[in-house]
From Swiss-Prot:
Residues given in the record as substrate binding sites: T57, G73, A74, A75
Summary of subunit composition and partner proteins: Heterooctamer of four alpha and four beta subunits.
CDD domains, sorted: Asp_decarbox
Pathway the protein takes part in: Cofactor biosynthesis; (R)-pantothenate biosynthesis; beta-alanine from L-aspartate: step 1/1
Top-tier EC class: lyase
NCBIfam families per the UniProt record, alphabetical: panD (TIGR00223)
Organism: Thioalkalivibrio sulfidiphilus (strain HL-EbGR7)
Reported modifications of this chain: Is synthesized initially as an inactive proenzyme, which is activated by self-cleavage at a specific serine bond to produce a beta-subunit with a hydroxyl group at its C-terminus and an alpha-subunit with a pyruvoyl group at its N-terminus.
EC number: 4.1.1.11
Name listed for the protein in its UniProt record: Aspartate 1-decarboxylase
GO terms for cellular component: cytosol
Keywords (A to Z) from UniProt: Autocatalytic cleavage, Cytoplasm, Decarboxylase, Lyase, Pantothenate biosynthesis, Pyruvate, Schiff base, Zymogen
Positions of modified residues (Pyruvic acid (Ser)): S25
Coiled-coil residues: none
Amino acid sequence: MLLTLLKCKLHKATVTHSELEYEGSCAIDGDLLDAAGILPYEQIQIYNIANGERFTTYAIRAEAGSRVISVNGAAAHKANPGDRVIICAYGQLPREEAARFHPRLVYLDADNRIVRTGSDIPVQAA
Protein backbone atom coordinates (compact mmCIF):
# COMPACT_ATOMS: atom_id res chain seq x y z
CA MET A 1 0.00 0.00 0.00
CA LEU A 2 1.23 3.52 -0.81
CA LEU A 3 0.76 6.29 1.73
CA THR A 4 0.51 9.95 0.75
CA LEU A 5 2.84 12.13 2.84
CA LEU A 6 3.92 15.74 2.98
CA LYS A 7 7.02 15.89 0.76
CA CYS A 8 7.88 19.54 1.40
CA LYS A 9 6.46 22.94 2.18
CA LEU A 10 7.18 26.63 1.90
CA HIS A 11 5.72 28.00 5.14
CA LYS A 12 4.24 31.50 5.27
CA ALA A 13 5.27 32.62 1.80
CA THR A 14 3.97 36.07 0.87
CA VAL A 15 2.03 36.38 -2.40
CA THR A 16 3.74 39.07 -4.50
CA HIS A 17 1.49 38.95 -7.58
CA SER A 18 -1.98 37.74 -8.50
CA GLU A 19 -2.37 37.51 -12.29
CA LEU A 20 -5.89 36.55 -13.44
CA GLU A 21 -5.17 36.83 -17.19
CA TYR A 22 -2.50 34.16 -17.18
CA GLU A 23 -2.62 30.56 -18.34
CA GLY A 24 -2.45 29.21 -14.81
CA SER A 25 -0.06 27.96 -12.16
CA CYS A 26 1.99 29.53 -9.40
CA ALA A 27 5.35 31.11 -10.24
CA ILE A 28 7.81 30.58 -7.39
CA ASP A 29 11.34 31.98 -6.98
CA GLY A 30 13.72 29.29 -8.30
CA ASP A 31 15.84 29.42 -5.15
CA LEU A 32 12.75 28.63 -3.06
CA LEU A 33 11.77 25.75 -5.36
CA ASP A 34 15.27 24.30 -4.99
CA ALA A 35 15.30 24.75 -1.21
CA ALA A 36 11.99 22.89 -0.86
CA GLY A 37 12.64 20.31 -3.58
CA ILE A 38 9.62 21.29 -5.69
CA LEU A 39 10.06 20.68 -9.44
CA PRO A 40 8.65 22.86 -12.22
CA TYR A 41 5.18 21.60 -13.20
CA GLU A 42 4.85 19.60 -9.98
CA GLN A 43 1.38 19.64 -8.44
CA ILE A 44 1.18 21.82 -5.34
CA GLN A 45 -1.45 22.64 -2.76
CA ILE A 46 -1.74 26.24 -1.57
CA TYR A 47 -3.33 27.10 1.77
CA ASN A 48 -4.14 30.79 2.17
CA ILE A 49 -3.67 31.83 5.81
CA ALA A 50 -5.44 35.18 5.19
CA ASN A 51 -8.77 33.82 3.94
CA GLY A 52 -8.78 30.05 4.47
CA GLU A 53 -8.85 29.20 0.76
CA ARG A 54 -7.19 25.92 -0.23
CA PHE A 55 -6.49 25.12 -3.87
CA THR A 56 -4.45 22.94 -6.19
CA THR A 57 -2.24 24.16 -9.03
CA TYR A 58 1.26 23.48 -10.33
CA ALA A 59 4.59 25.22 -9.81
CA ILE A 60 6.53 27.11 -12.44
CA ARG A 61 10.02 28.46 -11.92
CA ALA A 62 10.37 32.24 -11.47
CA GLU A 63 13.73 33.97 -11.61
CA ALA A 64 16.06 32.81 -8.85
CA GLY A 65 16.49 35.47 -6.19
CA SER A 66 13.36 37.37 -7.25
CA ARG A 67 11.39 36.27 -4.14
CA VAL A 68 8.32 36.05 -6.41
CA ILE A 69 5.23 34.09 -5.44
CA SER A 70 2.71 34.77 -8.24
CA VAL A 71 -0.68 33.07 -8.13
CA ASN A 72 -1.95 32.95 -11.70
CA GLY A 73 -5.07 32.19 -13.72
CA ALA A 74 -8.31 31.17 -12.01
CA ALA A 75 -6.43 30.65 -8.73
CA ALA A 76 -5.79 34.43 -8.67
CA HIS A 77 -9.34 34.73 -7.28
CA LYS A 78 -8.13 32.87 -4.18
CA ALA A 79 -5.03 34.90 -3.23
CA ASN A 80 -4.08 38.57 -3.25
CA PRO A 81 -0.68 40.26 -3.03
CA GLY A 82 0.34 40.41 0.62
CA ASP A 83 -1.53 37.23 1.61
CA ARG A 84 0.57 34.73 3.54
CA VAL A 85 0.28 31.18 2.17
CA ILE A 86 1.61 27.70 2.83
CA ILE A 87 2.70 25.88 -0.35
CA CYS A 88 2.89 22.09 -0.04
CA ALA A 89 3.79 19.17 -2.28
CA TYR A 90 2.98 15.57 -1.44
CA GLY A 91 4.44 12.24 -2.48
CA GLN A 92 3.53 8.58 -2.20
CA LEU A 93 5.74 6.02 -0.52
CA PRO A 94 5.38 2.39 0.51
CA ARG A 95 4.58 2.06 4.22
CA GLU A 96 8.10 0.82 5.06
CA GLU A 97 9.74 3.90 3.50
CA ALA A 98 7.07 6.25 4.85
CA ALA A 99 7.96 5.29 8.43
CA ARG A 100 11.49 6.68 7.90
CA PHE A 101 10.64 9.67 5.70
CA HIS A 102 10.98 13.31 6.80
CA PRO A 103 9.72 16.26 4.72
CA ARG A 104 11.73 19.32 3.68
CA LEU A 105 10.34 22.33 5.53
CA VAL A 106 11.31 25.85 4.46
CA TYR A 107 10.21 28.75 6.67
CA LEU A 108 10.03 32.22 5.13
CA ASP A 109 9.81 35.78 6.41
CA ALA A 110 7.37 38.39 5.03
CA ASP A 111 9.82 39.17 2.19
CA ASN A 112 10.11 35.52 1.11
CA ARG A 113 13.60 35.12 2.50
CA ILE A 114 14.48 31.77 4.03
CA VAL A 115 14.56 32.09 7.82
CA ARG A 116 15.25 28.43 8.58
CA THR A 117 14.76 24.92 7.28
CA GLY A 118 13.88 21.69 9.00
CA SER A 119 12.47 18.21 8.67
CA ASP A 120 10.11 17.90 11.66
CA ILE A 121 7.05 19.90 12.60
CA PRO A 122 6.99 20.54 16.37
CA VAL A 123 3.84 19.64 18.27
CA GLN A 124 2.01 22.78 19.34
CA ALA A 125 -0.36 22.52 22.27
CA ALA A 126 -3.45 24.71 22.21
